[in-house]
Amino acid sequence: MNAQNLSGLSRREACRRLLGLVSVTPLAMSWQGAIQPAFADAIGNTIRVEEDWYVKIGTPDPDSDSPQITSVIAPGWTLSGKYAVFDMNGATQPDFSSGGVQLQLWSNDSIRQTCSNTNWASLHFANEEIRYTSVMSIQDDELVFEIINGSSESWGAFGTGEMKLRVPTWRNHLNGYDPSFTTDNSRVGFASHRVRNFTLERIRYYSADGLKSTDNTPRVLHQYDPQM
């Protein structure tokens, strides 16, 4: 979809498409094969995954709540089960709200929990840089999703303890996590021409003994140069 089409979408339609990416596309892909394990090695099972994200904004438009960006994280190669969605510059649950950030916990295609920071400003600085870390972990028989170390000119610091959701789980490891699933389902959902870069910069894998490995391969989901 090109930038012109995205910029012409209504906010309601953009929200529908964002929700559609987590309720339709992954399920359509889930037949493709067995779960691909995440760095499961002799050191021990993976019980925590951290994804470092970077966003470079071009020229935002606060009047149209654009751009809107979403990242997704799940314990396996399917969204049939529990997973988390992180919305930036517009919360979609339970109804659309302008600006800010929102972490959502889903079960299949049903929303279960949400949490947000207290700053609901819309993105309004040109060339703004946003950084944050998405965390998924197993703690005390619970699957925990969290946003930490967030920074933004528009929103200030976020992910300082206020953005954490948890749910009981039968899982005792996260070996089924696959970064390709994250990148396939995370995207700039509205006004992509207002985003210069959206990149998953690195991934850290932890066992009960601590840090197992770090994947420093940058995964560029979106890149746009208005001069080209």
Task: List the model feature ranges, each with a label.
Residues 130-138, 143-145:
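Short tryptophan-centered beta-strand motifs in secreted/extracellular beta-sheet-rich domains
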